[in-house]
């Protein structure tokens, strides 16, 4: 399956100054780890360059969409027709899920490939210089499950994309 996983607020906040726009929440980090561990993670160069993110993300197959060289060993570089390459990853690794981490432009560009979206909805609004168009993203998405965090400040939701299209 091809999925996306990200956290946002009602304004579509996604990032600020090259990193997360809020302090990491242990429960949200556990949700991320639970779903992506031993899977494939795909991200754009700006997400990869986040100074707070370990490189590579441990116990995952890391793929970076970029035209620049990647100096970290054991990281796959995707460039050119990255959507086709993401689909090819499914063939190479049939027993793994692919999680597109971001940025928002890559998530929106790949929306027609995404089977499920794992979205952490955060209460309140944070300052950001990077946003995802939540209204556009949610078109065709149907909620399959949702649960609040222990502190009730987050809501962990899974959406199924009913408008999915596979080009291969």
Regions inferred by a protein language model and the residue ranges of each:
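Enzymes that bind and transform nitrogen-containing heteroaromatic metabolites
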Residues: 1-168
């Amino acid at each position: 399956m091809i999925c996306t996983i990200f956290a946002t607020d009602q304004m579509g906040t996604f990032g600020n100054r090259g990193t997360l726009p809020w302090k990491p929440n242990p429960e949200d980090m556990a949700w991320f780890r639970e779903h992506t561990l031993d899977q494939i993670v795909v991200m754009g160069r700006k997400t990869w360059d986040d100074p707070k993110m370990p490189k590579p993300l441990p116990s995952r197959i890391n793929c970076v969409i970029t035209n620049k060289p990647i100096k970290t060993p054991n990281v796959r570089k995707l460039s050119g027709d990255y959507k086709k390459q993401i689909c090819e990853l499914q063939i190479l690794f049939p027993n793994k899920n692919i999680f597109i981490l971001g940025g928002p432009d890559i998530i929106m560009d790949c929306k027609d490939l995404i089977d499920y979206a794992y979205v952490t909805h955060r209460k309140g609004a944070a300052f950001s210089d990077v946003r995802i168009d939540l209204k556009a993203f949610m078109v065709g998405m149907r909620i399959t499950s949702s649960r609040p965090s222990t502190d009730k400040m987050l809501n962990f939701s899974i959406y199924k994309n009913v408008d999915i299209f596979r080009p291969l």
